[in-house]
Structure formats: structure tokens, C-alpha cells
Curated annotation (Swiss-Prot):
Designated name of the protein: Putative boron transporter 5
Classification of source organism: Eukaryota, Viridiplantae, Streptophyta, Embryophyta, Tracheophyta
Protein's job: Putative boron transporter. Boron is essential for maintaining the integrity of plants cell walls.
Membrane topology reported for the UniProt record: Multi-pass membrane protein
Pfam family, one: HCO3_cotransp
Extracellular side, ranges: 60-80, 148-158, 222-238, 316-335, 499-565
GO cellular component, one term: membrane
GO process annotations (BP): monoatomic anion transport
Annotated compartments: Membrane
Organism encoding this protein: Arabidopsis thaliana (Mouse-ear cress)
Protein family per UniProt: Belongs to the anion exchanger (TC 2.A.31.3) family.
Cytoplasmic side: 1-38, 102-126, 180-200, 260-294, 357-477, 587-683
InterPro entries the UniProt entry points to: HCO3_transpt-like_TM_dom, HCO3_transpt_euk
Gene3D superfamilies: Helical hairpin bin
Length: 683
């Protein structure tokens, strides 16, 4: 099973026209589906809001440090809210979540370092010059969309995506270390004679910061795994897993006020940001007036960083969009890669002229959004289908009639302007039909006499559906607007908690990153490798010789070191995206000469293939599990958690290398284990 491939065309505007026509057919339905969801849509909305707002607040504090408060949390929140509203109303793929991301912060730091060192620009014209960079960036994005360049994303394989993810993770950890060290130092521009900056209080602030940073990281990581806790009800575990991280920020912020009263004001150090209505914040909205003050030489020089930023946004935005609409989610509405790049260009232009850092598609919030809507849609469909089945059984309907009633409900709830044919829908329900009829043949003719259990069998055989709509994206963007005006409360958060949140994001992104997994595998001695095979592991562990794994991983480590090293070069570090585009050519022309094609396919697979370490009933993306027959109940979100990586990427479960591998187990298959025999049926 391959990732959806972006279609290309030699005719200008062809991709945009195709995208607009495709999305226009379902635009009205996008709103109807969201409004019909009622208050239930608030669950995925708040879930995505907290997942989106916290990183943006952290990036705002980082920007404030890197640009000497030329930009702050006000601007990052405003950009996220503005771009989120625009995309939810006009975007092609409404499941895509936009926000200010680490690459943008990194680029803006390089641009600030360049402008500060030039008397013609300086801090005064920094944002005006950056606005010209955004103008060039927007023009380049327009050209990419017009000439259908989105198909190039097909050439970016796992090796590029995981190297980029690892680089961001390391930059997060780097920012954590820098932030923790800064807690022991006097901030730039502050009066060193103030009481809070005396040695003993600086040391106290640093130690408190260390406690808060480590405390948040530990509790956030623990709460993230709450669904697998053995105690508590399913609802409680799901709540802690979904909202545990922002909850821990609130808890640790509250604890920061429990310090002794003798501590001077400013210990522990808290978020520093102007309020939206302060004069400092209002000046950013008039940056367009200063653009004429930038000399022509610097206007044309802005094209160089714009080229890097446009390429970075194109890569990041398209990859995130792919992960938000993976085939395994069974989305009904078409993609809009070319049109979304065009719209991104307009948003970059608007943000630049308003003095805001632009927003683009973000990970893992976008696939998290899709996953939360899949859980919500499943709950709605399951509830109605179970009720219908029970009513039919109560009326002593035959098993075939029970199935037909449930089938009708499924078709009715799955209606969309671009819905699949009736035959395709029926094929997806084939396993449910077989379960109903099998029980009828074994136990009786009517639904009541048969062994068919609506609660168990509907839960096991219900296909994945996503509630594709625009309301949740719009609502979470409006909540971000609310966060802008809630800055007086947000400023109560200790800065050390934001450094801890950076560390949490870095650590949480490492599991399921195959580059990281292979790096760890290098340190496992041959006598202990059986331990790796005992747990769930990537398929390459069994299918590729260890020497080839080691060689491929060492190449990645060296290339990663090169990418990370470039980011340390003053000003010129802005060129680091070039290395990721160069990697496309290396992957296509050099690596096939160094590794066998079969090995390279495993090491750089399009999908995350996983082999179970111990025999157990596999969980399917169709939410079917025989565990329920053994009395084990798993909530919908827990099933999807096991099926997705930390990036939101869906896993493909395969048989072990030494097992019977007549075929690969795809998400739409179920393996039924009987009395010692194993058989599989395809939907």
C-alpha cells in the first residue's frame, strides 16, 4: 500500500483548477457535517487547540529571546489565529492545522542576526526587511502552485522526513538547554542591581527552573501514556492522555506560586510579553509603512533567504498535508495540494506585511486532528448502528434483515457529494455481514436466536470514517484568538515550563522515528538483539542484515551532523534547507548504488511497517479486535494510539520474517485466530 501520490501536469494552473473544482463540490457539505455534529465537535476542537496553542506560546518566548523582543508570543498567537481562520474558511484541506513552527523561528533568528549587523537595517527596519523576504517567498510559492510543483513531494522519502524531524528534535533540546542555562543568568538589557538579579536569587531562580523543567517533562510524558494505565476508567484515562500536558502546565504553574513569600518578585522568572493592546504590539501592524525605507539593494538581497524559506514551507506544508490525509483514514473528499500552496503564499504575504511570523502546516497537530475526528465519527456511527441492530433484534427480525438495517444506517451516515459507489461501501461492510450471517448459520435463523452481539461485533468490524468538516478547525482558531487576549493569564507561566515543554516535544517525537530506532540499535550487542525481536519492532530489523542497517544509519548520522552543523553558522545557517533538497538526489542516484534495492526499500519504506514481537491479536485500522471477545475493552482513541506513530503516521502491521508470509497484513485485514489455525479475510 503506497502513500497518495500528488498528481502533476505540464499545463500551468491545471493543478490549482483541479483542486478548486474538487473541493467546491464538497465545500457546502464541509459546513453541514460540522454543524450537524452538535456539541460533540467540541471534543476534537479543544483537543487540537491545546495541542496547537502550547507550542505557539513556547515558540513566541523563543522568538522573543532570539530577536531581542522584536517579536513575542503576541505575534505567534496572532499569526496562528489569523492563518487558521483563513485556512478553515478558504483552505483546500480543512483537516490541516496551521501554526508558527520551529523552522520559522529558526529562519527569523538568522534574518534578525543579519539585519542587526547592518547599519542600513538594524533592529528598526528588521521587520520591514523581513516583509520583503515574505513578499519574495509568496511569489515563489505562487509560481510553485501555478506550475504544479506539488508533485515533487513524491520524491521526498522517509529518509528526508525523519532527518528533518530529528533535526527539529535536537533543536528543541538545544533550546531547552539554552533556556535552562539562561535561568541562572541576567537577561540582556536588565538592571543587574535589582534584588532578583543578585547571586543568591539568580541561583535560586535557576534551581527552581531546573525543578520545574524536569518536573514538567516527567509528568507530561507520563500523562501522555495514560491510556495504557491499568487503573482508572476509560474516560478518565482518555481525558488525562488528551489533556494531560496542558493540565500539567497548569499544575506546575500553580505550584510556582507556592514558593516562600521572602522570594523577591521575579523569582521564579515568568513569561515576558507585551499585551495585544500595548503600543509596542500595535506598531507591528504598520510594518508595511516602513517597507519603503528599505534600500533597493536589500530588497533584492531578500530573494536569497526567501528562496530557502519558500522551499522549506513547500516541503513542510506538503508533508504535513500528506500525513493529515493518509489513505488509511479512508477520506472521501479530494486533496488540494496545489491550491493549498497557493493559499499559503497569500498567508505568508499577509503575515509579512503585518509584521507577523508566517504559519504553515504543523506536526503532529494535523494528523492528530484527523485522528480525533475519526474517533468522533466512529462513536456516532457505532451508537446509531448498535441502536438499530438492537431494535431489529427486539422485533425478531432475521439476521439478514438485521444486517440490511445496519447497512442502511451506515450508508446514510456516510453520505457525501463525493462518496464511494454503493458497491465499494458494501465491500467495506463485508466482514460485518459475514459475522452476522455466520452467527445465524451456527445458532439460529433470527437475530435474537443467533449469537450476534451488536455491541461486540459492530465494534470489531466498523470501518474507519473521518468526520470531514471545517467547523473544528475554525473553532480552534477562534480559541487561539481568545488566547491572544488571555495573555495576562498566560504571562503567569514560568519560562522554565516552556523550556520543559520544548524537551517534552523533542522526547515525544523520538519513538517511532526509524532513524532514532536504528541509531539505538547500533548500541545493542549481538547477544542482546533477541530482546529487540521480543517486542514490536520495525520490519527492517528482520529483513535487512545488521551490517546494511549499520551502514545506512551511519550515513544518516553523518548527514544529520552536517545539517546540524550548518545551523550553527552565523547568518549562512539559513541555507540548511538546501541539504534536504540535495538529499533527494542522493537518495535517487547514489544510495541505490551502495545498497541492494530490496534493503533500501525496507530502510526507506514509504510506510511504517511493524512486526509484532509476541503473538497477540493485532489491532486493525478498521477498529476490529477479538480482544472484546475475551472481555478486554479498549477505547477508540487507544486503538488509534497503537496504530499511529508520534508523528501521526499510520503503522502497517506485517508478519514476522520467520512466519508464514503469504501476504502482508494491511490495515483493512483481520487475522482471526481459531483453534490453532490462522486465516485472513480481506475487506
Amino acid at each position: 500500500m503506497e502513500e497518495e501520490r500528488v498528481e502533476g501536469s505540464k499545463r500551468p494552473f491545471q493543478g490549482i483548477i483541479r483542486d478548486v473544482k474538487g473541493r467546491a463540490l464538497c465545500y457546502k457539505q464541509d459546513w453541514i457535517a460540522g454543524l450537524r455534529s452538535g456539541f460533540g465537535i467540541l471534543a476534537p476542537t479543544t483537543y487540537v487547540f491545546f495541542a496547537s496553542a502550547l507550542p505557539v506560546i513556547a515558540f513566541g518566548e523563543q522568538l522573543s529571546h532570539d530577536t531581542e523582543r522584536s517579536l513575542s508570543t503576541v505575534e505567534t498567537l496572532a499569526s496562528t489565529a489569523l492563518c487558521g481562520v483563513i485556512h478553515s474558511l478558504l483552505g483546500g484541506q480543512p483537516l490541516l492545522i496551521l501554526g508558527v513552527a520551529e523552522p520559522t523561528v529558526l529562519m527569523y533568528k538568522y534574518l534578525y542576526d543579519f539585519a542587526k549587523g547592518r547599519p542600513e537595517l538594524g533592529k528598526q527596519l528588521y521587520l520591514a526587511w523581513v516583509a520583503w523576504v515574505c513578499v519574495w517567498t509568496a511569489l515563489l510559492l505562487f509560481l510553485m502552485a501555478i506550475f504544479n510543483m506539488a508533485y515533487i513531494i513524491n520524491r521526498f522519502t522517509r529518509i528526508a522526513g525523519e532527518l528533518f524531524g530529528m533535526l527539529i528534535a535536537v533543536l528543541f533540546l538545544q533550546q531547552t538547554i539554552k533556556g535552562m542555562v539562561s535561568e541562572f543568568r541576567i537577561p540582556k538589557g536588565e538592571d543587574s542591581k535589582l534584588e532578583k538579579y543578585q547571586f543568591e536569587w539568580l541561583y535560586t531562580n535557576g534551581l527552581l527552573g531546573l525543578i520545574f523543567t524536569v518536573g514538567l517533562v516527567y509528568t507530561a510524558l507520563k500523562s501522555r501514556k495514560a491510556r495504557s494505565w491499568p487503573y482508572g476508567t476509560g474516560c478518565c484515562r482518555s481525558f488525562v492522555a488528551d489533556y494531560g500536558v496542558p493540565l500539567m502546565v497548569v499544575v506546575w504553574t500553580a505550584l510556582s506560586f507556592s514558593t516562600p513569600s521572602k522570594l523577591p518578585s521575579g523569582v521564579p522568572r515568568r513569561l515576558v510579553s507585551p499585551l495585544p493592546w500595548d503600543s509596542v504590539s500595535l506598531t507591528h501592524w504598520t510594518v508595511i509603512k516602513d517597507m519603503g525605507k528599505v534600500s533597493p539593494g536589500y530588497i533584492f538581497a531578500a530573494f536569497i533567504p526567501a528562496l530557502m524559506i519558500a522551499g522549506l514551507y513547500f516541503f513542510d506544508h506538503s508533508v504535513v498535508s500528506q500525513l493529515a490525509q493518509q489513505k488509511e483514514f479512508n477520506l472521501k473528499n479530494p486533496s488540494a495540494y496545489h491550491y493549498d500552496i497557493l493559499l499559503l503564499g497569500f498567508m505568508v504575504l499577509i503575515c509579512g506585511m503585518l509584521g507577523l511570523p508566517p504559519s504553515n502546516g504543523v506536526l503532529p497537530q494535523s494528523p492528530m486532528h484527523t485522528k480525533s475526528l475519526a474517533v468522533f465519527k466512529r462513536q456516532l456511527m457505532r451508537r446509531k448502528m448498535v441502536m438499530t441492530a438492537k431494535e431489529s433484534i427486539r422485533q425478531k427480525a432475521t439476521s439478514s434483515q438485521v444486517y440490511e438495517d445496519m447497512e442502511q444506517v451506515f450508508i446514510e451516515m456516510d453520505k457525501s457529494p463525493l462518496a464511494e459507489t454503493h458497491t465499494t461501501l458494501i465491500n467495506e461492510l463485508q466482514d460485518l455481514k459475514e459475522a452476522v450471517m455466520k452467527k445465524s448459520d451456527d445458532d439460529g435463523d433470527t437475530g435474537e436466536e443467533s449469537g450476534f452481539d451488536p455491541e461486540k461485533h459492530v465494534d470489531a468490524y466498523l470501518p474507519v470514517r473521518v468526520n470531514e468538516q471545517r467547523v473544528s478547525n475554525l473553532l480552534q482558531s477562534l480559541l487561539v484568538i481568545g488566547a491572544v487576549f488571555a495573555l495576562p493569564v498566560i504571562k503567569l507561566i514560568p519560562t522554565s515550563l516552556l523550556w520543559g515543554y520544548f524537551a517534552y516535544m523533542a522526547i515525544d517525537s523520538l519513538p517511532d522515528n526509524q532513524f532514532f530506532e536504528r541509531t539505538v540499535l547500533l548500541f545493542v550487542p549481538p547477544t542482546r538483539r533477541f530482546k529487540v525481536l521480543e517486542g514490536a519492532h520495525a520490519s527492517f530489523v528482520e529483513k535487512v542484515p545488521h551490517k546494511s542497517i549499520a551502514a545506512f544509519t551511519l550515513f544518516q548520522i553523518l548527514y544529520f551532523g552536517l545539517c546540524y552543523g550548518v545551523t550553527w553558522i552565523p547568518v549562512a545557517g539559513i541555507m540548511f534547507p538546501v541539504l534536504f533538497f540535495l538529499l533527494v538526489a542522493i537518495r535517487q542516484y547514489l544510495l541505490p548504488k551502495l545498497f541492494k534495492p530490496a534493503y533500501l526499500r525496507e530502510l526507506d519504506a514509504a510506510e511504517y511497517e511493524e512486526i509484532p514481537g509476541t503473538p497477540r491479536n493485532p489491532l486493525e485500522l478498521s477498529f476490529r479486535s477479538n480482544n472484546s471477545a475475551r472481555g478486554v475493552q479498549e477505547c477508540d482513541a487507544e486503538i488509534l494510539d497503537e496504530l499511529t506513530t508520534s508523528r501521526g503516521e499510520l503503522k502497517v502491521r506485517t508478519l514476522g520474517h520467520n512466519e508464514d508470509k503469504g501476504h502482508q497484513i494491511y490495515p483493512k485485514e483481520i487475522v482471526e485466530v481459531g483453534d490453532g489455525d490462522m486465516s485472513s479475510s480481506r475487506e
